[in-house]
Curated annotation (Swiss-Prot):
Coiled coil: none annotated. Transmembrane segments: none annotated. The lineage of its organism: Eukaryota, Metazoa, Chordata, Craniata, Vertebrata. The gene is Tcaf1. Residues 542-841 form the Peptidase M60 domain. This is TRPM8 channel-associated factor 1. It comes from the Eukaryota.
Length: 924
């Protein structure tokens, strides 16, 4: 099939003017299909003639039938028929409604004849858009490889019929919509036309009186909110970007969890996680959704085998289902989770021709397993769903109640907000609903990840954003001059990032103030720099490998690796500041400043808008060894490796390497901080040896081998997404914490509770964690252990919260309320573990954490808190050979009767400190 660009050239060959009939008032066309493209567009951006493809065939759509009867348009009509023909000898049939077209074609030497109906002997069929009896035949004719030339207007038809839903009832739309082209009831202006040399843009937004409010109301009938609070899942956020797609459940930040869309003759509903198919509170909505998808046909509802729980929920509401492994030919609705082998073409045609699709899936786990690969481009669910105007993103949403759109209120939608952004940017005035511009920026950046090459529906958005952002200089966000996120300037930062990552020309994105770390000031090396990178990864997850190189901002770099490395699933990452700030009210830096991409070719060009340290992301179990990496456009950055870098070499690097960020590394920890702070370190060796001692203690308590298979990372940033520090890979902290990380004397005298707290968070395992109670508690065991065993700082001095009088008061307050897990959190929860440690030492913890870590997946540890807590009681009791059930009961733990009975054979723990508390506790 020819590309839209090539097709446009063929259709416009020799066309020098649009001489349309003066007394004909056409309608505006709406284009949503990935194969659809505009041909004739007026000066206000309305599409009047378009083309598309469906199945093996093609269609050309005119917004008034008179366009197909106008002899002055003979050049275009001849081109259209020629493009629609599958071969030069294909027969052309013309419906009697377009009889004059036969003579126009004949005058140009093209034979055609009147045919009352489309049939298989024809290669092209020409008809107006008002025929109600032939719609199914016309769709199948095109699908099998036929060419369709169709014209009509819907605004007049709308005034005459009983059904005012033009998009879904107008006869022409029952045909052309399968290819993503719709006749609307908007009148089109015919005062001025320009013959385009290149394909014109598709408008961002076509406003139709025929909106989707009836569909939304039907789906949400009787629904107050969509509550998934206790669903035990984190759904993916949905990007709703199609003109006929609409959100159904939104959080306070306008993040969408469930959405629906019309596509062709069919309908789609998407949830951000398959678990939502099993949530009892969503039962009424699930019933509404399946009935809406069925469209009143009372047809066969097919549920994918893996989702059989949904069948039970639907049965309660009187809907019978058929459980099948795949879509069946007689299905009316198909409920499923898309996997790697999803039949994209089959399912898209199923919907286009009237089927209903109910999809549940999340993409954040796929994104975690595939760093540097956009889920919008490669996630199996999105290969199917992008075309429907709904995409699954890697951003997760917190489980909770999601509000539903209310009648008469405006709801955030990417396209409508982008259209308003366009108006504001053009006029420098306007008003958008609160929070919409803060959402537009990241949504736009996400949308730009959808592959757009030769897909006009997406290319038009790229072109618009390039045009808008090239008119104005990019804001520069700093701590001294922050940028408000929910405004045009904030949106520009995210949109510029998306454009840069999509390959747009960086010369269009000029900042208000030139960054001192941009290529203009840092001046990358004229010759390429080659470094050797260790690409062996014995760990169980991907890891970053430092290169010691920094990429200046607003730069395109060329990266080269050997052929063997290009096929090893390596990724390139520019930048280490991974926190997503899109929900921050003020921005001290761009909201998303790293760029990841696949290193899938021996030589690759990569765009860098913000600059940053360069890393290779190495997949788990990689055994590549040392890989030579050659980079053109980089500068060197200070990098110190314990045991490898000499003191003299370190001094030289600080003097000669201009990179503004540097790293201090051991085999177990890597600290990333500004170079300005590193200049205070004449000799990092004592500091890093201390860090290695602390990391050894962290590993020992957690039952982990040492040296670590992969080093932990701590990165300082001008702004992070949450808290003073947070765990993860990497651990993130504020710039104010840098001295705490790199000042050995300070560490030895005052300790460093915060960083070790986050290292402890990274040690937590779901098998022995009881969220939310212990989330901020058990990690502090590592703080106490490291401070006491490595730094020699007792717990009472390491943190004021562990001063003995404070601890005792906390326990008594807890007991005075009646011991209950409901109140057992944070420092109170930690006290339980500290009492055990003070009685039995650290060894039981070390042995127990090791035992948990070494458990095989076949042992199937419990997943709910009550069972996990009882397992902990049993295992700790066995470790210390004491019956600890009474101790934990005193703390209000939900000890199961059978567990208490099973531990009765063990000796009583006579020194149980909780006995003393209970004996001396004032009655409450």
């Amino acid at each position: 099939m020819a590309t839209p660009s090539a097709a446009f050239e063929a259709l416009m060959n020799g066309v020098t003017s649009w001489d349309i009939p003066e007394d004909s008032v056409p309608c505006e066309l709406l284009l949503i299909g990935e194969a659809s493209f505009p041909i004739m567009v007026n000066d206000v951006g309305q599409v009047l003639v378009a083309a598309s493809s469906y199945g093996r065939g093609r269609m050309v759509v005119a917004s008034h039938e008179d366009f197909l009867l106008e002899s002055q348009l003979f050049v275009f009509l001849v081109n259209a028929v020629g493009w629609l023909r599958s071969s030069p000898n294909s027969a052309i049939g013309v419906h009697s409604s377009l009889a004059p077209l036969v003579k126009i074609l004949e005058s140009c030497g093209i034979e055609s004849k009147i045919e009352p109906e489309v049939n298989d002997s024809l290669g092209v069929y020409c008809i107006d858009a008002y025929n109600e009896t032939m719609t199914d035949k016309l769709v199948q004719f095109v699908k099998r490889g036929g060419g369709l030339l169709i014209g009509g207007e819907a605004w007049d038809w709308d005034t005459q019929g009983d059904d005012d839903r033009v998009l879904f009832a107008f006869p022409g739309n029952l045909v052309t919509s399968v290819a993503g082209v719709y006749f609307t009831d908007n009148k089109a202006d015919t005062s001025f036309f320009k013959v385009s040399k290149k394909m014109p843009k598709i408008p961002i937004l076509v406003r139709c009186d025929d909106d989707l409010s009836d569909d939304r109301d039907e789906l949400l009938r009787g629904i107050i909110d969509l509550d998934i609070t206790n669903s035990d899942c984190f759904p993916s956020q949905l990007l709703v970007h199609g003109s006929l797609a609409f959100p159904l459940g939104l959080d306070t930040y306008h993040g969408c969890v469930i959405a629906a869309a019309r596509y062709g003759r069919g309908r789609v509903v998407v949830t951000g996680h398959k678990v939502l198919f099993t949530v009892g509170k969503l039962g009424p909505f699930l019933l509404n959704a399946v009935r809406w998808l069925d469209g009143g046909r009372k047809g066969k509802i097919v549920v994918q085998t893996e989702l059989r729980t949904l069948s039970g929920l639907l049965a309660v509401g009187g809907i019978d289902t058929s459980i099948e492994p795949h879509l069946t030919s007689d299905a009316s609705v198909y409920c499923f989770e898309p996997t790697s082998d999803v039949g994209v073409k089959e399912l898209q045609e199923f919907v286009a021709e009237g089927g209903g699709l109910f999809v549940g899936t999340q993409a954040w786990w796929w994104a975690f397993k595939n760093p540097g690969v956009s889920p919008l481009a490669r996630f199996p669910g999105n290969l199917l769903l992008n075309a429907f105007g709904i995409s699954i993103t890697s951003q997760s949403l917190n489980p909770g109640p999601f509000r539903t759109p209310k009648i008469g209120t405006r709801t955030y939608h990417f396209r409508s907000t982008l259209a308003e952004f366009q108006v504001i940017m053009g006029r420098k005035r306007g008003n958008v609903e609160k929070g919409w511009l803060a959402k537009l920026g990241p949504d736009g950046a996400t949308f730009l990840q959808i592959p757009a090459e030769e897909i006009p529906a997406y290319m038009s958005v790229h072109r618009l954003l390039r045009k808008l952002l090239s008119r104005y200089r990019l804001p520069v966000a700093t701590r001294e001059n922050p940028v408000i996120n929910d405004c045009c300037r904030g949106a520009m930062l995210s949109l510029a990032t998306g454009l840069a990552h999509s390959g747009s020309d960086l010369s269009l994105l000029i900042p208000e103030i030139e960054d001192v770390y941009s290529s203009r000031y840092l001046r990358p090396s004229a010759s390429p720099i080659t470094v050797n990178v260790n690409c062996t990864n014995p760990g169980t997850r991907y890891c970053w490998m430092s290169t010691g190189l920094y990429i200046p901002g607003r730069q395109v770099i060329d990266v080269s690796v050997p052929e063997s490395a290009a096929s090893a699933d390596l990724k390139i990452q520019i930048g280490c500041h991974t926190d997503d700030l899109t929900r921050a009210s003020k921005l001290f830096r761009g909201p998303l400043v790293i760029n990841r991409c696949c290193l899938d070719k021996p030589t690759k060009s990569i765009t860098c808008l913000w600059g940053g340290l360069l890393y290779i992301i190495v997949p788990q179990n990689s055994k590549l060894g040392s890989v030579p990496l050659t980079v053109k456009g980089a500068v060197r950055a200070p990098f110190y490796k314990l045991g490898e870098t000499s003191k003299e070499e370190w001094k030289r690097r600080l003097l000669e390497y201009p990179g503004p960020w540097g790293e201090l590394a051991t085999d177990n920890i890597i600290l990333t901080v500004p170079t300005a702070n590193l200049r205070t370190l004449e000799n990092p060796e004592p500091l890093l040896r201390l860090w290695d001692e602390m990391m050894q203690a962290v590993a020992k308590l957690g039952g982990e081998t040492f040296p670590l298979r992969l080093p932990q990372r701590i990165v300082a940033d001008v702004q992070i997404s949450v808290g003073w520090m947070h765990a993860g890979y990497p651990i993130m902290c504020h710039l104010e914490s840098v001295q705490e990380l790199i000042n050995e004397k300070l560490i030895r005298t005052k300790g460093l509770w915060g960083p070790v707290h986050e290292l402890g968070r990274n040690q937590q395992r779901q098998e022995w964690e009881f969220p939310p109670h212990t989330t901020e508690a058990t990690c502090n065991l590592w703080c106490v252990y490291v401070h006491e065993t490595v730094l020699g700082i007792p717990r009472s001095r390491a943190n004021i919260a562990l001063w003995p009088p404070v601890r005792e008061k906390r326990v008594r307050i807890y007991l005075s309320k009646g011991p209950s897990v409901k109140h057992w959190n944070a420092w109170t929860a930690l006290e339980t573990y500290l009492q055990l440690q003070e009685a039995f030492g650290w060894e039981p913890f070390i042995r127990l954490f090791t035992e948990y870590r070494n458990q095989t997946t076949s042992s199937s540890p419990p997943s709910d808190n009550v069972d996990k807590m009882n397992l902990w009681v049993k295992m700790f009791s066995q470790q210390v050979q004491r019956n600890l059930a009474p101790f934990f009961e005193a703390w209000g733990w939900p000890i199961q009767k059978e567990v208490a009975t099973s531990l009765a054979y063990l000796p009583e723990w006579k020194e149980n400190i909780m006995k003393l508390y209970l004996l001396t506790q004032m009655p409450h």
